[in-house]
Amino acid sequence: MSISISSTSYLPTDQKIWKNLSLLTKKITFNEYANLHSGFNHNYKIDYSIFIIFFHDLLGINANEKVKIFLKNLKDYLKKYNSNVLVALSNYDGNNNVIENAKNLIINKKIANNFKKNIYKLTTLYNNLLFVDLDLPFSYYGYKEIFDSRNWYTYHMRISYKTLSIIDKEIYQV
């Protein structure tokens, strides 16, 4: 079995961190971070293509366009290949302004919610597509322990090392 992992943020490749997935296979490859599309471009059979998306990484002027491109590439990939695809998403955007969030659904949240809705819709059309909402296990542990801005400046990794074991466990369970 082979697993290919693409992410919007840097993920360490040490097998010890990915201990649950390593139980399934030793053939785990990590694509270039911040380049989700590299996960779609390969000429060999992959049993599981995993896309780990931190929506905060997609924010900016072209966020909506980035989402549309990813969804189009995902649909094309699902039609072309028979491999399993897992999309793991956290749409936490770091905006903890209670007042701002009380009255308006911020445009970034609208885009994130629409993205999630489209992924769920695709899971009904393609049996080989799975979705993991990372915000569910993350909320259990608390966002303060999950996201670590110090890691962003050091490694371009938004999350703590503890979070990596949570992601590994959640993907393994699916």
State what each model feature region is:
Residues 37-69, 90-101:
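Oxyanion-hole/transition-state-stabilizing segment in secreted/luminal serine hydrolases
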Residues 14-18, 60-62, 96-103, 142-144:
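A short acidic (Asp/Glu
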Residues 1-35, 41:
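Serine-esterase "nucleophile elbow" of acetyl-processing enzymes
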Residues 97-132, 164:
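Substrate-gating cap/lid alpha-helix
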Residues 63-76, 107-119:
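Well-ordered, non-membrane alpha-helical segments in soluble/globular domains
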Residues 91, 127-144:
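Acidic carboxylate-rich catalytic motifs and surrounding loops in phosphoryl-/glycosyl-chemistry enzymes
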Residues 17, 145-174:
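Histidine-centered active-site loop/cap adjacent to the catalytic His
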Residues 77-85:
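A short helix->loop->beta-strand "cap" motif at the edges of active sites that frequently abuts
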